[in-house]
Amino acid sequence: KQFTKCQLSQVLKSMDGYKGVTLPEWICTIFHNSGYDTQTIVKNNGKTEYGLFEINNKMWCRDNQILPSRNICGISCNKFLDDDLTDDVMCAKKDLDSEGIDYWLAHKPLCSEKLEQWLCEEL
């Protein structure tokens, strides 16, 4: 599914303020990772990254490419490609708990200041 900024802001409201990360920071980071498209798959340094949050198959989810995956989220990577973001959010929070927001490389250079453009006026 291709989300808009406002659709995604609505769905991800529960992430606002989690571990000190604001919703606009998430919206910006997701935009730079996946362009708000749940079908995103990126091959990167021998890993494959899935979905809005670019969750990878080396640490967080399992697919049939890398054996063994640590599979910290205990889930198939393909679950991050569907329209239900519940499991994506759960795994992204685990990722954040473990690694911090700068684990998403777009965050620090692109999403740590001047965040007004990432707010949804409709909320």
From Swiss-Prot:
SUPFAM superfamilies in alphabetical order: Lysozyme-like
Keywords annotated in UniProt: Calcium, Disulfide bond, Lactose biosynthesis, Metal-binding, Milk protein, Secreted
Pfam families, sorted: Lys (PF00062)
GO cellular component terms given for this protein: extracellular region
SMART domains according to UniProt: LYZ1
InterPro entries: Glyco_hydro_22, Glyco_hydro_22_CS, Lactalbumin, Lysozyme-like_dom_sf
Stored Gene3D superfamilies: 1.10.530.10
Residues the record lists as binding Ca(2+): K79, D82, D84, D87, D88
Listed GO biological process terms: defense response to Gram-negative bacterium; defense response to Gram-positive bacterium; lactose biosynthetic process
Tissue specificity statement from the Swiss-Prot or TrEMBL entry: Mammary gland specific. Secreted in milk.
Major location category of this protein: secreted
Domain C-type lysozyme: 1-123
UniProt record similarity statement: Belongs to the glycosyl hydrolase 22 family.
Role description: Regulatory subunit of lactose synthase, changes the substrate specificity of galactosyltransferase in the mammary gland making glucose a good acceptor substrate for this enzyme. This enables LS to synthesize lactose, the major carbohydrate component of milk. In other tissues, galactosyltransferase transfers galactose onto the N-acetylglucosamine of the oligosaccharide chains in glycoproteins.
Name of the protein: Alpha-lactalbumin B/C
Organism lineage string: Eukaryota, Metazoa, Chordata, Craniata, Vertebrata
